[in-house]
Amino acid sequence: MSAGATILARGALVGAALVAAGCGAGPAVVARDGAGHEVASAALPASGEFALTYRHSVYKTAAEERFRATDGGFVLDSIASRDGRVLDYYELDGARTREGALWVLRPDRPARFETMPLAATRRGQRTLVAGTRHVPLYGGPVHLKLVVEQ
């Protein structure tokens, strides 16, 4: 194989590996710091669904905010926790159901975001979940902005 063909073959292998690792084209959820630098990201599954998990500061229990990517941003589809008081904390009207051990609130009027500011503290342990990826957002800058990028 010529040197040029070897370089092309290696480039194709690297490109395939990046796509397989979720680093290729396609929408992703990205967390940026105050200066706009990327702190963390995760490729979105085909469904466009992702979540933020965290430890609630008042009730000291796990909670999950579930989102879905849309054209130009994302929507809060539901909030889930083992402790129903977490759902009360949001003060949103909507349908409450059970999913196994979890209480789930589906807001009547889901909040829509282009970007969403959030605090990522060690205490809250905020984590981005997209597909099978769990990306901790805490341990670096505290004040972040979440955005869906195409």
Regions found by a protein language model. Name each.
Residues 1-12:
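Bacterial N-terminal signal peptides that target proteins for export
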Residues 10, 82, 86-89:
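Generic hydrophobic/packing signal
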Residues 11-20:
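Bacterial N-terminal signal peptides
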Residues 30-83:
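N-terminal secretory signal peptides
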Residues 50, 68, 75-78, 88-150:
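Mature, soluble, non-transmembrane domains
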